[in-house]
Amino acid sequence: MNNLINIKEVEAKLKFTFTQPQLLVTALTHPSYRNETVTITEDSERLEFLGDAVLCLIVTEHLFLLFPSMDEGTLSTARAALINAVSCCQYTDALGLGEYLLIGKGERIQNERGRTSAYANLFEAILGAVYLDGGLAPARQITVPLLPSKKDILPLMLGNPKNRLQQLTQKQLRTLPVYQSTPWISPQGAPGYHIRVIVNDEIWGEGFALSKKEAEKLAAQEALDANDYKDKNTVDL
């Protein structure tokens, strides 16, 4: 057992007690840490593979039951947004598990892309470990509370907010939105982006994020919300 990991703390955050705690240790072991530590023989990659499938099943079932009249194409769009790397990274952050990741000294996760990838893989690996140890029920109990509310899933079903905003401005105003970027520093001191979306020389929305792509999406969504835009393909809530 790795003495660097406080198993009880992680279990408390998950609200799940492992009968095979070594599974949790393996899930927390990044491949780079195994490569740099001669006493470690297993890393998280196989558990990530399993956890990815478990997450897909849980989210699929959740959406299927939540929206009984929704077609499979729209459900697939929402599912893709709920299981992508950005979402899985957010699940890790929500659970407060990032600090327990065992990662090699040579592995860089300071930048947003590296952090997102590492934390997303961590969530999937932990979910795989929980599934192996306790089955689908505890994996579901961990995952479902992390998912957005029914109301917040609606924008995911309608697609990328940038595309929706462009469709709106083209149809109603015969113009395209313009995105202006300026540097931004997060409260934690990390460099990021402040994006303003401009339509007909007016600021429609703003977004702040560590990645430019995410900041643009947030700005577009704020613009849509401010203009009370509703897609034709609405979902009954």
Curated annotation (Swiss-Prot):
Residue ranges that the Swiss-Prot or TrEMBL entry lists as coiled coil: none
PROSITE patterns documented for this protein: DS_RBD, RNASE_3_1, RNASE_3_2
SUPFAM superfamilies: dsRNA-binding domain-like (SSF54768), RNase III domain-like (SSF69065)
GO biological process terms, semicolon-separated: mRNA processing; regulation of gene expression; rRNA processing; tRNA processing
EC number: 3.1.26.3
Major localization class: cytoplasm
Cofactor(s) essential for the protein: Mg(2+)
Similarity field: Belongs to the ribonuclease III family.
Protein name (record): Ribonuclease 3
Species, as recorded: Chlamydia felis (strain Fe/C-56)
Chain's gene name: rnc
